[in-house]
Amino acid sequence: MSKVRLLDQVRQTIRVLHYSRSTEDAYCYWIRFYIRFHGCHHPIELSAAHVSQFLTFLAVHRNVAAATQNQALNAIVFLYNRVLQQPLEHIDNVIRAKRSRRIPVVFTRSEVQLLFRNLKQPYLLMAGLMYGGGLRVMEMLRLRLKDIDFERKSILVRAGKGNKDRVTILPDNLIENVQHAMDRVAAIHRQDLAEGYGEVQMPYALARKYPNEAQSLHWQFLFATAHRSTDPVSKKEMRHHIFETSIQRAVKTAMHRAGIHKPASCHTFRH
């Protein structure tokens, strides 16, 4: 079995389990790194001791953060448990990366108001949903039209942290702007359909079970991009959601304009 085929297996398994694209990319990166670290030996030939050596190398020689080391461990455990279906024995004798003891950065109410005044749509609505609904940045970006419930004033967050669904509030002051965003997506979708497109990326299992649903309006992303792009999985031209870097850049720019000098990010809206 070649390395290429192994990584293809990893990607396929991740997609069956509905993990995010960022998790897929991260896991493949660490698995590839792990294999190369051990001289390109197939993981089936390696043991828990080899995993310990790799994790220790990351902490001692690469000086990675604890979260980074844990991500590498999760990727390798996933490889053995889910892909190779040969769980490792207990992994011990690992030098753990040191955890930072930083106090979480928090925006004051006045800072939030300043930030909002320096944000334009659709980024203002995005920030509002993260702040008022407690959404993580990728949870917000992956919202579909069907996830918004105006009657109950709620938002369904699909496959959030831990791959779990949950319901959160839709703040009253955001309802009008959410409706405007949905109207925009509906207009874009009509144009896409007229041009012979209109598909959106679907969760793996649903895409196979309901192939026609990919063109349904209710599955379209709330924060759709201005232009279509080629989906890396299906190779079809689709309309994806706005990139994470776009909202991150908008928030950083708004912080600069507002004179807020904190090591903050989109995640700070949740604190």
For the regions a protein language model found, what residue spans apply to each?
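Conserved catalytic core of the tyrosine transesterase superfamily
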Residues: M1-H271
